[in-house]
Structure formats: C-alpha cells, structure tokens
C-alpha cells in the first residue's frame, strides 16, 4: 500500500518513524569503539527473505517459466532481514521508483542483550 492509498477502513495509514538503538550503546563491556574504523570497509551479505517453502525434487525439476511458488508468509507480513545468514531485523517491502526496498520496522535483539 502506498502512502496515498487508504486502508481497509477508508483512512490514510499512519506512518511512524522507528527509533533504533545507537550501535555504540549496545557494545559489550570492554569493547573499544575506536577500533571499529578497521572494520568499516568489510563487506557483509545482506539478504531480505520474503518467505520459504519446501518442495520435492520432482516438483522442482518440473518447474518452468510461469510456475508460481507459494511461500509461507502472507502478503503484507513483515519480511526477514539477514546479515550473513543471521536474522537481524524485520521490515516491510516498499517500492522506490521502480525498485523494491525494505523499511526496517524492528531490530531483533540477541540473547545477550
């Protein structure tokens, strides 16, 4: 749904900002943030996962152009944001010009936090 569209009850959706914790405030005790400069140019893989499904090999081999794959998430449900394969946040899919994007709506806290 775009910002200009109305929700099911006929009202424009309310858009709220998300307050994310400052990374420096979440560092474990004894970690010196001045050493982070060495890591700033390290690349990490960021993946946005719309959903998952499981299929038998025969079904996968039978796929062709036009095959529709149903995923385990509903349309409009938050998507998972992973860094190097580990879920770190949830977000909502947005369209920016002609590209897809993701607006972060929740940062997943680790067990240590």
Curated annotation (Swiss-Prot):
Nucleus found in the keyword field: no
InterPro entries xrefs: FliN, FliN-like_C, FliN/MopA/SpaO, FliN_T3SS_HrcQb, SpoA-like_sf
GO cellular component, one term: bacterial-type flagellum basal body
Entry keyword annotation includes Cytoplasm: no
Subcellular location: Cell inner membrane; Bacterial flagellum basal body
Main location: membrane
Gene Ontology biological process terms from the UniProt entry: bacterial-type flagellum-dependent cell motility; chemotaxis
Keywords from the named record: Bacterial flagellum, Cell inner membrane, Cell membrane, Chemotaxis, Flagellar rotation, Membrane
Source organism, top-level taxon: Bacteria
Membrane topology: Peripheral membrane protein
A Pfam family assignment: FliMN_C
Family: Belongs to the FliN/MopA/SpaO family.
NCBIfam families: fliN
Chain's role: FliN is one of three proteins (FliG, FliN, FliM) that form the rotor-mounted switch complex (C ring), located at the base of the basal body. This complex interacts with the CheY and CheZ chemotaxis proteins, in addition to contacting components of the motor that determine the direction of flagellar rotation.
Descriptive protein name: Flagellar motor switch protein FliN
Highest classification ranks of the organism: Bacteria, Pseudomonadati, Spirochaetota, Spirochaetia, Spirochaetales
Designated gene of the protein: fliN
């Amino acid at each position: 749904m775009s910002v200009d569209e109305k929700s099911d009850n006929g009202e424009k959706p309310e858009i709220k900002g998300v307050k994310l914790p400052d990374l420096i405030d979440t560092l474990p005790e004894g970690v010196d943030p001045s050493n982070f400069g060495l890591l700033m140019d390290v690349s990490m893989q960021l993946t946005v996962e719309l959903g998952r499904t499981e299929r038998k090999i025969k079904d996968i081999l039978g796929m062709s152009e036009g095959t529709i794959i149903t995923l385990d998430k509903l349309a409009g449900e938050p998507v998972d944001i992973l860094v190097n394969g580990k879920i770190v946040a949830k977000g909502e899919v947005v369209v920016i010009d002609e590209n897809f994007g993701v607006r972060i709506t929740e940062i997943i806290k680790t067990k240590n936090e």
